[in-house]
Amino acid sequence: MSEQKQDVAATEEQQPVLQIQRIYVKDVSFEAPNLPHIFQQEWKPKLGFDLSTETTQVGDNLYEVVLNISVETTLEDSGDVAFICEVKQAGVFTISGLEDVQMAHCLTSQCPNMLFPYARELVSNLVNRGTFPALNLSPVNFDALFVEYMNRQQAENAEEKSEEEQTKH
């Protein structure tokens, strides 16, 4: 009986763990520098969108992940800035039982994927409060971004290795 309990405990220790501890807004900014005259122009927006993540280990198996979203909208004809919206949506996650690549995937894909709906809603709300037309950000495929990042890393490593071999000869 006690052997079964030990086996179960050992199995539970080996299981990957990903738990949300807290989700919060770390920083938010909304600027509409050309109000009110921007509303007198024809609304032909040009949208600029930037996305990045930051990860910090804050304790044993405890990580803060910050999803940074920046949206800048200008008018096509005049080039005037309609609005700039910046959101840092953050979360603290308990993560354990993962190897290096799995951990990197979790921190740069799974965690941001959980944070994105909160950030998207906040951006939409801020734009709405500025009385601009609705802005609904499309979903982001963080898995594809992670694969792209890993491929770039492998290509850079192969290039560095090739350069090292050429300098040795």
From Swiss-Prot:
Pfam families, from UniProt? SecB
Question: Which cellular component, as a GO term, is one annotated location?
Answer: cytoplasm
Its domain of life reads Bacteria
Q: What biological-process terms (Gene Ontology) are attached?
A: protein folding; protein tetramerization; protein transport
Name the Gene Ontology molecular function terms of this record: unfolded protein binding
**Subcellular location field:** Cytoplasm
Q: Where does the protein principally reside?
A: cytoplasm
Query: What keywords does the record list, in alphabetical order?
Result: Chaperone, Cytoplasm, Protein transport, Translocation, Transport
Q: How does it assemble?
A: Homotetramer, a dimer of dimers. One homotetramer interacts with 1 SecA dimer.
Entry's family note: Belongs to the SecB family.
Q: What does this protein do?
A: One of the proteins required for the normal export of preproteins out of the cell cytoplasm. It is a molecular chaperone that binds to a subset of precursor proteins, maintaining them in a translocation-competent state. It also specifically binds to its receptor SecA.
| Protein name as annotated | Protein-export protein SecB
Species annotation: Haemophilus influenzae (strain PittEE)
